Amino acid sequence: MGDTAKPYFVKRTKDRGIIDDDDFRRGHPQQDYLIMDDYAKGHSSKMEKGLPKKKISPGNYGNTPRKGLYGVSSNPYAFKNPIYSQPAWMNDNHKDQNKKWLSDELAGNADSWREFKPGPRIPVISRSRKESFQESDDAYRWQEGRGCRAVRRLFQKDLSSLEAMSEMEAGSPENKKQRSRPRKPRRTRTEDSEQDGDLDGPVIDESVLSTKELLGLQQAEERLKRDCIDRLKRRPRNCPTAKYTCKLCDALIDSIPFAHKHIKEKRHKKNLKEKQEEELLTTLPPPAPSQIHAVGSAIDRVVQEFGLHSENLDQRLEIKRVMESVFRHKLPDCSLRLYGSSCSRLGFRDSDVNIDVQFPAVMSQPDVLLLVQECLKNSDSFIDVDADFHARVPVVVCRDKQSGLLCKVSAGNENAWLTTKHLTALGKLEPRLVPLVIAFRYWAKLCSIDRPEEGGLPPYVFALMAVFFLQQRKEPLLPVYLGSWIEEFSLNKLGNFSLKDVEKDSVVWEYTDNSTGDTSSAKEEAPKETAAKKGQVPLTFNIKHQPSVPVGQLWVELLRFYALEFNLADLVISIRVKELISRESKDWPKKRIAIEDPYSVKRNVARTLNNQPVFEYILHCLRTTYKYFALPHKVTKPNLTKPPSPVTCVSDPYREAKNGGPEPQATNIDKLGNAAVAQDPGVQTSGDCRAQLVTLKNTTEEVGSPAKEKTGGVHIPAHQESSGCVQAEVSCEGLEDATAELPETGSDNEEVRRKTKHPLSTDDQGLSSSKHPELQNCGSLCGLQADNTLELVAEECNSCASLDNKAEVNEERIEGAEELEEAAALSCFSPSVQSRTSAAMHFDDEEEEEEEEEEEEPRLSINLTEDEEGVANEHQVDSRYAGSGEEDALSEEDDLAEPAKGEDTGECGENVGGTLLIDLNRITLKEESFPEEDLPGDQSEFFYEFRKLTFTKGKSPTVVCSLCKREGHLKKDCPEDFKRVQLEPLPPLTPKFSNILDQVCVQCYKDFSPTIVEDQAREHIRQNLESFIKQDFPGTKLSLFGSSKNGFGFKQSDLDVCMTINGHETAEGLDCVRTIEELARVLRKHSGLRNILPITTAKVPIVKFFHLRSGLEVDISLYNTLALHNTRLLSAYSAIDPRVKYLCYTMKVFTKMCDIGDASRGSLSSYAYTLMVLYFLQQRSPPVIPVLQEIYKGEKKPEILVDGWNIYFFDQINELPTCWPEYGKNTEPVGQLWLGLLRFYTEEFDFKEHVISIRRKSLLTTFKKQWTSKYIVIEDPFDLNHNLGAGLSRKMTNFIMKAFINGRRVFGIPVKGFPKDNPSKLAYFFDPDVLTEGELAPNDRCCRICGKIGHFMKDCPMRRKVRRRRDQEDTPNQRYSESKEKRSKEDKEIQNKYTEKEVSTKEDKLTPCAAAKAKPVRAAVDLGREKLLRTPTEKWKRQDDRDSREKRCFICGREGHIKKECPQFKGSPGSLSSKYMTQGRASVKRTQQES
């Protein structure tokens, strides 16, 4: 989880349970505990809720599956989604509610705590789902400098390890049986009691305050409560100086001034707005039947306009038939089948045509697609033929010439066909699914979130989401396929179940009893037929028992389900089971969306959504769309005749009153509210300023003088200091909107902005029921006597003097109309709903506007005071609201250049000079009962449409690269792709510089090649070990392989030994793991060996140990016979030409100096680089060496099978001149070849398209090998399934290629003289600071203990070995004093060693990477804080010391360091350290990398 969920630990004592539990609850009200069993360790599906469920508030509807596997507030949405856990601010008595909420969720009773205690309690911090990693860091930023900095640092540093938490929890009272917690010393207990005494005091001592001060404090705190900031009831232990807490931001505040500063912060404002928005969405009631009908009509229009119909399906079938005729000659045994939306009808008319080729088993997928590509290119029926063979599903893309539809042809895509077959059957049996999915997909298309290549979701995912929703409804419309009715079913065994096919409207499932299988992940492998059990489940319910739910209602419920109810961050969308599946059970990372394909259950099909901004954008669109469809929206009827609705706009000195002729029904004004629109004198107005007005009672009065007046309940104060004043009175009758059009004022350089606040208050007096059917569902009447104060403040109306700004104004008009319409729509809801949602109506998510508001003064006066409320309440206008359809009349393509029609609207003057000021402080609405015939009863008045701006509010998805995770570009344009690096041309190679390169290459061979004596010593070690092992393993034979025998070995390189047993040609019938463990036990008896370590989890089990006398590290593997033949092959190549050895040694020196030559640490092995050198020499023109595996004397290539692979190669090197015609033709010097190698791999060779393979001369494509997902592909010459570059990450690949590119520059640009800081040629050419640009090799995949990849620190074999040794030392048979003395002595040695190392590092100005990480925490100023910090710091010091002791060197056998840091290793003769790194600057830089 990283920074998004830092654990919080609770201190415990022996006498009482949780210390400061109240304090813990107040300081972290969003935390919850997950109770797990010991077996699960957080990844089992048997997770239980540790807290009681919260009841859903009465205002909510629909089921809430978020309460599935987690506690009420354990998900990231709980704090922002009151539907899930209703917070305190939802009720008026929020003090008591908050207290009850905390006590229910976190305290509970003793029985409830004891009921759920199968394992450790893991705290989960409830986070907003919109929070990213950066926002989580910002959540504590305000505390810096407030007296809590040191505590917060300690909190982040010391309490972030889950393992340490488990160890602490092991000592809790509920786990006393497992481990007894030692009693605290008396001094510590005394200090704790003193601390508790200090913290138990009042947060603010009111007894010392005067009456005036106390009154001021109460008033200030009442003001803070409105912003969700309350006084603490007790000082928190982690920040004793805090006095207040912000519930929204989960922040501690020291004083009232700091609280006011916190209120002004953008983070608090954002959280407040989000809270208001969530309140609005949560409290919206279900849509009325008339609304449902209107929503259904909107969906029907989408289906009719964009959906697939019978003629479209026939057209796609015809394309398939044409393609079959094209393939008939080249692929006679293959058949085609449609899949995707072309078959299921869950798509659009212009959707791609997906065609899959079924081919016989004798053919391979690459062969089939290459033939498909060839056929389509030669066909006249298809154009624009292209191939995308590097996609996850390789396809050939073309376009049908007649219809213009895009066709994608795949081969053997069985899972996609099964999923399509499933969805097709569901669409035929459940008719409501097709329009629901088409609407969902069209919504996604409008919002631009159905583009997986841009970080969105695959289109068919929305069909799975719709099916999942229909299964999870309170009254489900579709069944699930696996459940308790199956005898063997349980969530723990879900991985053993798989869906196989759809037959006769039923799903065929299969169960495999795999007791040894991993239940945490689903199994896709085909099980054995003998252990398989099959069954069938119907696809749909019985028609008689299905509820009749219209599509419009399902659409609104689907939006609510995913916007508010379902926990997308923690749960998996799976249509197989009814139970909710956690991500831990599938071992999928949290965050964003997880969707399981029912026929490919290992894969998260939503993993293309790989960035947080797009995820937040999807949630924004879901919430916005739900709010749009949940609120009533009316359609404007221009043909209806209504009494005139005069709108009088007065400007001084220009005043016009339009009284002649009928007024239009609706007037377009963007916003009406408390705003002042200023204009410079003499500036011509341009554009128009539109807003929707709520319908008022039909009263027509003239506006008086510019002085302060009270007219018809609209309070309009005039500003005398302004040059002009516009006062407006709006009145209309019935249910239609009054419309007024005001000329905008402004200039090219000035923008008029308006800010909206929308408190909608209701006095709950005199309410009675309405008989109108639509409004009964809302729980209140629009036509009842009620005092509803609706304050409308004009928002963001920009003056436009040029056409460039017109598009922006158009969007603001539409958005403003939408927000005002939603505000007025709430007038038909109950007063309680209005009061809870009033403050959230005009929610603005644009952060840019907030930044502008902070940077500049508002240009519009907003006069909101407490005194004005009473004045406004005295003058109310009787009114009612019947909805507005203005928004539907507008669209994204509205032409803003259309002139304003003054004769049709209330015009407020043209060419106004001076300052135009609109100051409408309040519009009060007073509802009265009206005749029933006047109420909106016609269903046709509700109108909805699918529009992008309505769903997105002007936002767009963030473009994030899936490769580097940075914003602003896509993967195909990623600058980190090494193929996109622009290489500078190299100057011509001079003869003098070429001679220098020759000398460098030859010197590398002379310096590092082993001598004859060393080769003899290695053979002697082999013989000695073989004779020793034979005593326990008779018939054992040891053989040297690898660098010791292939001709490319270094001095002091590892000794690789292969062990075989007479009578066994292969390892079949042998228990390799047990044999390796027994071999390790035997080798421990050898007095000349140290650090024997069996590694049985590797691909080839080995025993590692250290040979004392020679100082060599030895690896013994069992039946690694292919490696023996690889050694023979490389040895044969090294004997062909001496330049082969020179280049291979130069390559090995280059890779070791750049730290890219160790496969165990995530890079390539030296064997892989040797193959790269051989491949280059084979591809050179003319070639330096032949392809030995392609040279043979007979007509057919011989076969010599070992482990199922042909290991034949031409090994008669003496006869090579007669068998290979190219022998001796290449006479290039070795230096020129070395530079040519660097240029070949940086300029010519295409790593994406081709494979490095020394077994064939012709090029081999990555698609042919089906290794398209890897970065560097190197094929083993014998084991053709082994890719030596499979372990490379993107970071390491870029690091390797950067080294090659820099090497090309260093070795390719001639120099006249060498710099003084590089005294030798080798130090100049192999300077790691130049080759790697001073960067260290990526180690993010390496273990922190041993530095190897393939495991993490907790699974490190060296760590387990240390633990076993300590357990043996602490056995009762040994004396405690001796073991204690021994351990303390070792600890002192380690401490002295690291002290000396740090001193030497400071002298050399280096920073060692492996130094101990324990750093003393900076002590706080006051004494109480020192007491708080003392104990945890010492504990973590001991922890870090223990981690350093768990490191053990393979060479010297001592603890505290690894082989790379060993002085013996660095000082060994012939090593890189002694040769190059002690020469000038290279020594310093290299030491920095190695330490």
UniProtKB/Swiss-Prot annotation:
Point to the regions of Polar residues compositional bias. 1470-1481
- Which GO BP terms sit in this record? miRNA metabolic process; oocyte maturation; polyuridylation-dependent mRNA catabolic process; pre-miRNA processing; RNA 3'-end processing; transposable element silencing by mRNA destabilization
Start and end of every PAP-associated domain?
551-600, 1230-1282
Give the E.C. number(s).
2.7.7.52
- The zinc fingers classed as CCHC-type run over 959-976, 1341-1358, 1447-1464
Q: Where is this region: Disordered?
A: 165-203, 740-774, 834-911, 1362-1399, 1463-1491
Listed binding positions for Mg(2+) are: D1054, D1056
Q: Which residues are reported to carry the modification Phosphoserine?
A: S132, S172, S600, S747, S891
Q: Which UniProt keywords apply?
A: Cytoplasm, Magnesium, Manganese, Metal-binding, Nucleotidyltransferase, Phosphoprotein, Repeat, Transferase, Zinc, Zinc-finger
State where the protein is found: Cytoplasm
- Sorted alphabetically, which InterPro entries does this protein's record hold? MTPAP-like_central, NT_sf, PAP_assoc, TUT4/7_NTP_transf, Znf_CCHC, Znf_CCHC_sf
Organism domain of life: Eukaryota
| Record field: compositional bias (Acidic residues) | 844-857, 885-897
Q: Which family does it belong to?
A: Belongs to the DNA polymerase type-B-like family.
What protein is this chain from? Terminal uridylyltransferase 7
**What is the organism field in this record?**
Mus musculus
User: What are the top taxonomic ranks of the organism?
Assistant: Eukaryota, Metazoa, Chordata, Craniata, Vertebrata
Gene (name only): Tut7
